[in-house]
Amino acid sequence: MQYSFTEKKRIRKSFAKRSIVHQVPFLLATQLESFSTFLQADVPTAQRKSEGLQAAFTSVFPIVSHNGFARLEFVSYALSSPAFNIKECQQRGLTYCSALRAKVRLVLLDKESPSKSVVKEVKEQEVYMGEIPLMTPTGSFVINGTERVIVSQLHRSPGVFFEHDKGKTHSSGKLLFSARIIPYRGSWLDFEFDPKDVLYFRVDRRRKMPVTILLKAIGLTPEQILANFFVFDNFTLMDEGAQMEFVPERLRGEVARFDITDREGKVIVQKDKRINAKHIRDLEAAKTKYISVPEDYLLGRVLAKNVVDGDTGEVIANANDEITEGVLEKLREAKIKEIQTLYTNDLDQGPYISSTLRVDETVDKTAARIAIYRMMRPGEPPTEEAVEALFNRLFYSEDAYDLSKVGRMKFNRRVGRDEITGPMTLQDDDILATIKILVELRNGKGEVDDIDHLGNRRVRCVGELAENQFRAGLVRVERAVKERLGQAESENLMPHDLINSKPISSAIREFFGSSQLSQFMDQTNPLSEITHKRRVSALGPGGLTRERAGFEVRDVHPTHYGRVCPIETPEGPNIGLINSLALYAHLNEYGFLETPYRKVVDSKVTDQIDYLSAIEEGRYMIAQANAAIGDDGALVDELVSSREAGETMMVTPDRIQYMDVAPSQIVSVAASLIPFLEHDDANRALMGSNMQRQAVPCLRPEKPVVGTGIERTVAVDSGTTVQALRGGVVDYVDAGRIVIRVNDDEAVAGEVGVDIYNLIKYTRSNQNTNINQRPIVKMGDKVSRGDVLADGASTDLGELALGQNMLIAFMPWNGYNFEDSILISERVVADDRYTSIHIEELNVVARDTKLGPEEITRDISNLAEVQLGRLDESGIVYIGAEVEAGDVLVGKVTPKGETQLTPEEKLLRAIFGEKASDVKDTSLRVPSGMSGTVIDVQVFTREGIQRDKRAQQIIDDELKRYRLDLNDQLRIVEGDAFQRLARMLVGKVANGGPKKLAKGTKIDQAYLEDLDHYHWFDIRLADDEAAVQLEAIKNSIEEKRHQFDLAFEEKRKKLTQGDELPPGVLKMVKVYLAVKRRLQPGDKMAGRHGNKGVVSKIVPVEDMPYMADGRPADVVLNPLGVPSRMNVGQVLEVHLGWAAKGLGWRIGEMLARQTKIEELRVFLTKIYNESGRAEDLESFSDDEILELAKNLREGVPFATPVFDGATEEEMSKMLDLAFPDDIAEQLDMNPSKNQVRLYDGRTGEPFERRVTVGYMHYLKLHHLVDDKMHARSTGPYSLVTQQPLGGKAQFGGQRFGEMEVWALEAYGASYVLQEMLTVKSDDVTGRTKVYENLVKGDHVIDAGMPESFNVLVKEIRSLGIDIDLDRN
């Protein structure tokens, strides 16, 4: 087994029973693949597929002018490279995007030519089409300087759907069937039955019309309509009665209304008897072809065709007419023998279309189309052209109607056609096929569709959503271009004069900036980032709304298995509408979710992996991943638990066709991080998944001792760690950068064989948490591609580490863990275990105002020198300054209007030229309740404005850093070149050279070392070929130097040019404050099993319960929090964590004793290879074993994968290994070694019973008391009511509401009540008077009229009721 450089340092012992057949796919693949198919940036123009931008362009172009003599054709498009990189865009508040340019061709035709196809002129040109935001390598977008994510949308797939109302519409509870054809874009077409069994249709949910109007509009006559939906009974009229053609199936189950006889007149079925299978057999045996029927049998039947008199051509009866005695008489008079009637019965052949035809009053195609026009455009006169145009545009025009590839595939599958491709508009036979299936459903044949089935819901990803917006923009452009194309020739216009890119830019900007699906990225920790990108929402444009979504849509569906996680979804109004992709889920070409399965052939499990969609999966019998498999791959058990069409059952192995890939296949990333998930109640697991996303990164991340083995995948895929792009040797490392000399076999010729990784240091995330990367490699380390070089926030040696491992005791402690409160030891705070750094960004802008420009300066009047002490000469705070609330960070003055001056001021001005009163101080100060250290300052200056010293210094520092990178690259490139050169020169014969090298001398190493490297090029070699090589190496080094100088120049130009700032802004300063948050009472904490609580008290170490060896517990939790919540996983985690730490202590003790390496190896083998997945420790060298052991001293990390975790036996084995009997006895453990005798820290007495003690990975969540604590004395008031504002953000007060008033009334505290409702709230004059009185030292209250009463009076007056106050 191959271990990466970082994995070797600390191997996680896995208890998995199953080998890994299929690696977890790259977790951000959906986003990245979708967007790259949208752009197709790296695909050569000729090879671009018709999807994404290409599809949008080809669907709108060519654009033809109204007169047809000019057209604009699309040739190709290209994307330029972005002007700024991602980091620069974030700093400057720009969008990381690329300019889109399309090459278009304007073709003008010759108006004079008779054929209208002679090309007169062709103009080709590249036209700017707006900016397209680019995706970062981690799947997000930088829009206006902030990272955003486009969430995928789960919507109803285009196609045709059949459903019924479940009997809710009509009081009788009758099922009313309906069908709906949903295109990708265009009008919806609905068909529905009413309670009288008449079939109607509607377009776009407008008023309903009989469906036969639509059938007539597509060109069918009533005869053709009936022929499409009914089978006919054939009758031959006789002088008395008639002969009916005998069709056995149609008679079965009917009651004979007359004696049925055979040809000889023998009675086979007597009158009023029900016809059964025996009667049918008898009639068939008698070879009956016709049955004689009396005349009244014909009455009430419906004619299938128009009956025409052969002689006169007169229509005697129309199709769909009922046969009455009068009609029969006419038929006999016209000597008509043969007639056809519709065959209907009450059971499975209803007369629905026939009764619909009776309701329909239109006569022909034109009338039908006019009726549809009137329904769509009421009140407009139906002219012939308008009627035709509207009808054709509804379903037949490619511009207005698009079923899409998916829609056509779904449609054809549903109506039972074999081919899955076809036209993208609706065809006549599509409408017919839909109505036929709907009528069959009403007749009791077939099944309705389940709209929550994942085969009927598809995912729209970023690429598709962006394409739709882009197309919308292009369509707006198309309208404008059509108008102008007519003038193209006369005004000699070029393509760029015709196309205005504004509509495209605004459509794209609106989508990425403010669409419901474009969300501010949740960046609290790597997991929240990755989950946000894997989220699937049913909300958004074209989706559901919270209010309308019922229970069924939100519920877990059998087809979610392996596609959508049944656990991870928000609590609250969005439950079930926002989901997360399962671990292995993947999208197919149509946008349906697929999940991988292993193929099973003849009861043997193969390694072939097939991805199945929800529809395909229904056809197979699929075994669960935990089915027992023998060594030969055969299924061992007699009965295997499996699923077929959503039902779970036990079947014999020979019926199994597929098997799950992994037990964790059904859950999402967050849920798969919960160890012992199988022992937790789903509601609590849901909370656990959601709360892991809120874990704040700690100052020193610590890997979970009990994990699930997927931590490394999450950390690496999230992009928070730094991975080696190419293998090589670490050449240089410091806290901020890593330089790697690339292996020769991986270096590409002509490229620099150096990789430089600049680490992210103390950067603010979207949620104000701190992103900081720390190198984990040393100089000289050999790394290969994909190895982790540096840890990011919340990662430890390349593994996700959201919290800390705490020593937990489950016991009550003086009521401080009542109702889930958490008791914590002071040592946890002292060791900074849960200390986190939060970074706040504070901005100030200097604008150009009407009265003059604002100025950023240190020179502010009325401020004491103490307050300006932290500012430099430019008026900007120093980096490293520690600031409190109210301190000045950036000095700024704003000009204010001229005021009337007193004579004294005029005099002062005249003498001293004093201007100070003209400006007011608008400096940036630290907001209330905040304090911290300034860690970074950025200054942006508009072009054409002089930079201050501070701004210049920042630029110089940045250039210095960049030059350092280039120098490192050059040093390594030159070093490599000179090494190659030395190897080439040694032993060669020289014709002369520096330091009087004689002709014919052989060059040796000592001579070369004595020379300066650059003088090597002056050696004249005897060998011409070698001389050429020498020259080539010299040229390549000079070329590289030149390249580096150019790169430096470009960087300098970019930094020294003015910044793009919003209009009217001259200068912008951003100050970053690092705030250290220690754990304190009121902070919310949680485990991974939904066991959340609030810190109630931080107890001195000496008062905490402790063990016999003096070790105190870190956290005390309430044991009552476990049974009712049914999340027993936390107890198992504590037991396994106890074993993990115990093993770590034993290894630490062995290292302290300086045990032989061999003994260590044996002990480690015992831990890793006695149960669960074996690790290959044989391949480790002694040094590697030693390093591994050193890293395991803090606990052997365990992995217990979900649904495939550690068993009770394995856990007790590990506990026995960790705590031999002598240690167990010393700690007074119970026999199973998971409970320990604890002593009360305050009295030293042992507690009565042993206590469950162990290690749990515990998280500090983002709900910190510091962000919520708030107090106000005076502050802002609401404009209308004059009551204090509410909320911390507004520096508001606490609302004293109706119920609180009742409480004071109950106490009879009338004076308190009076001041609450007047001077402390909205009595404006009263509150100023109180202040005045307090200043005078006179403590009385004069309560006046509350402002809200005046508002009430005005409100009543506005209703026309005069109301006045009688004042006493």
Curated annotation (Swiss-Prot):
InterPro entries: DNA-dir_RNA_pol_bsu_ext_1_sf (IPR042107), DNA-dir_RNA_pol_bsu_external_1 (IPR019462), DNA-dir_RNA_pol_su2 (IPR015712), DNA-dir_RNAP_su2_dom (IPR007120), DNA-dir_RNAP_su2_hyb_sf (IPR037033), RNA_pol_bsu_bac (IPR010243), RNA_pol_bsu_CS (IPR007121), RNA_pol_bsu_protrusion (IPR007644)
One cellular component term from this protein's GO annotations in UniProt: DNA-directed RNA polymerase complex
SUPFAM superfamilies: beta and beta-prime subunits of DNA dependent RNA-polymerase
Keyword Nucleotidyltransferase: yes
Residue pairs linked by disulfide bridges in the UniProt entry: none
Domain of life: Bacteria
GO molecular function terms noted in the UniProt entry: DNA binding; DNA-directed RNA polymerase activity; ribonucleoside binding
Binding partners and assembly: The RNAP catalytic core consists of 2 alpha, 1 beta, 1 beta' and 1 omega subunit. When a sigma factor is associated with the core the holoenzyme is formed, which can initiate transcription.
Function statement: DNA-dependent RNA polymerase catalyzes the transcription of DNA into RNA using the four ribonucleoside triphosphates as substrates.
NCBIfam families reported for this sequence: PRK00405.1, rpoB
Similarity comment: family membership: Belongs to the RNA polymerase beta chain family.
Protein name according to UniProt: DNA-directed RNA polymerase subunit beta
Gene: rpoB
